[in-house]
């Protein structure tokens, strides 16, 4: 049985015709890492549409796992205060929890983060400390009820 689960989003490589975001308004944790800030923790990003221009979003960035730059979208584990994950539709739409402990970043935020395409990584750890991971090269949510599309698996779970 797994006792620790983390889910991470990573960006697709920036295309030549895309504008590079200024360092002071990164779109995700990979842009924060690319700007030279390499400490894991809570950071502010500015995800694209459907957010209003300039709306900041607080996220937890993992700068260590698999070369870093991952935007953490969920974390569950053994923390002093356990987060209740039995939420309604609005709870999962908007997100909940404490970014430094257990949380869900929110379906609407994940949708906005993955408009240009994402990869997703799942890290698991059991009670004995045995770890596993699954990495999918293509991940997205649709705007209609957040329908999931995922493909391109590699990993050991």
Give the location of each predicted region.
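Intrinsic-disorder-preferring feature that marks N-terminal prepro/targeting segments
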Residues: 1-12
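Extracellular beta-rich globular recognition domains, centered on the fibrinogen C-terminal
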Residues: 17-157
